[in-house]
């Protein structure tokens, strides 16, 4: 047996009906589209959300909220990520050099998640109260 000799079982595959090829095919003339109307025409589609001229739902509901652009360039740093930084001084540049955060991140905040055992100095990063307590308990410090 070879791959080029394989074929599906007899009767397993049905050829598709060809539209508009005579009345004997069962799909001649209108080709299964019915008579007249927008959906019978070429390119006859209605756009997403169209409700036949009725005011659509997405316009009936009020607008709300916005997407913060600062959130896109802000990262949360776990305590165990601080150990990946070379040296014991953690800055934004040091985190980028250690590939903890991407190059486009402009702000970072250290959060209380994971564990920290070695003493590190946090410089120029925002720190939550719980994370600050954990860093100081491990013998580290937080500088503004």
UniProtKB/Swiss-Prot annotation:
A Pfam family of this chain: Ribosomal_L27A
Residues in coiled coil: none
ATP-binding is among the record's keywords: no
Any one annotated GO CC term: cytosolic large ribosomal subunit
GO terms of molecular function: rRNA binding; structural constituent of ribosome
Region (Disordered): 1-51
Annotated InterPro entries: Ribosomal_uL15 (IPR030878), Ribosomal_uL15/eL18 (IPR021131), Ribosomal_uL15/eL18_sf (IPR036227), Ribosomal_uL15_bac-type (IPR005749), Ribosomal_uL15_CS (IPR001196)
Compositionally biased region (Gly residues): 21-31
GO BP terms, alphabetized: translation
Keyword terms, alphabetized: Ribonucleoprotein, Ribosomal protein, RNA-binding, rRNA-binding
Biased segments, Basic residues type: 32-47
The protein's role, per its UniProt record: Binds to the 23S rRNA.
Cited HAMAP family: Ribosomal_uL15
Family: Belongs to the universal ribosomal protein uL15 family.
Subunit relationships: Part of the 50S ribosomal subunit.
The protein's name: Large ribosomal subunit protein uL15
Organism: Actinobacillus succinogenes (strain ATCC 55618 / DSM 22257 / CCUG 43843 / 130Z)
Protein encoded by which gene: rplO
């Amino acid at each position: 047996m070879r791959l080029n000799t394989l074929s599906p079982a007899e009767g397993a595959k049905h050829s598709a009906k060809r539209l508009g090829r005579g009345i004997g095919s069962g799909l001649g003339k209108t080709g299964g589209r019915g008579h007249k109307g927008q959906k019978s025409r070429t390119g006859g589609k209605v756009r997403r959300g169209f409700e036949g001229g009725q005011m659509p739902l997405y316009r009936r509901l009020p607008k709300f909220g916005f997407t913060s652009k600062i959130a896109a360039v802000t990262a949360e740093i776990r305590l165990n990520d601080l150990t990946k930084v070379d040296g014991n001084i953690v800055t934004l540049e040091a985190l980028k050099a250690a590939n903890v955060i991407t190059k486009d991140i402009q702000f970072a905040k250290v959060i209380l998640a994971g564990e920290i055992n070695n003493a590190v100095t946090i410089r120029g990063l925002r720190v939550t109260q719980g994370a600050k307590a954990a860093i100081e308990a491990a013998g580290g410090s937080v500088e503004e």
